[in-house]
């Protein structure tokens, strides 16, 4: 189980202080003014993160749509919030929000892969912060199965559920032409080869 460590301070830490003081050698997030340092993730989490990151990044590169970052890129959303999403996408029209130390503003698309210790924040404080900041699309994916998995798109300033189609495929609303077959995610952790999945997506478009 992935565990969380909270770095307690007398006063809430600001995003500027977080970018200055956060450790460079491990993942850390600023949630409501508190620096949270998770323990190393489980293998099941990393396998899913690796598959989705490579698939999305390769698609975005082929289509020249923007840039994709992994779980060590901090995002300054608000004064007291600077999460490090598992996967994020910034469209080519908004690359100016990418700074030397991280992202300054809302990414277009965020994916969080749930764990027992992070799900509460992913569905709670971070969900609300992403929504307030204007993240246009938010996927919360449970590596153990579809039951806890949720997909959202921003409509009139609020996250609304975004459902897969009748065939079990989910199309992104921010990365045009990108979609996933949900069966790829829960097939005994035997993910299809990334190149094979990418070609399936490209051939369908």
Predicted segments with their positions:
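Gly/Pro/Ser/Thr-rich low-complexity, intrinsically disordered segments predominantly at protein N-termini
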Residues: 1-205
């Amino acid at each position: 189980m992935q565990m969380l460590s909270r770095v307690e301070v007398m006063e809430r830490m600001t995003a500027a202080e977080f970018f200055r003081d956060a450790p460079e050698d491990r993942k850390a997030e600023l949630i409501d003014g508190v620096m949270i340092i998770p323990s190393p993730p489980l293998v099941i989490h990393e396998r899913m993160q690796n598959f989705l990151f490579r698939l999305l990044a390769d698609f975005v590169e082929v289509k020249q749509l923007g840039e994709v970052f992994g779980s060590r890129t901090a995002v300054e959303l608000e004064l007291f919030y600077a999460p490090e999403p598992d996967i994020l996408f910034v469209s080519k029209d908004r690359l100016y929000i990418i700074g030397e130390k991280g992202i300054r503003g809302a990414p277009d698309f965020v994916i969080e892969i749930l764990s027992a210790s992070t799900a509460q924040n992913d569905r709670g404080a971070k969900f609300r912060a992403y929504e307030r900041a204007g993240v246009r699309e938010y996927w919360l994916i449970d590596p153990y199965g579809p039951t806890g998995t949720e997909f959202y798109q921003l409509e009139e300033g609020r996250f609304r559920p975004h459902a897969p189609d009748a065939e079990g495929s989910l199309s992104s609303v921010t990365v045009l032409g990108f979609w996933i077959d949900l069966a790829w995610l829960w097939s005994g952790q035997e993910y299809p080869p990334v190149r094979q999945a990418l070609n399936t997506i490209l051939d369908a478009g």
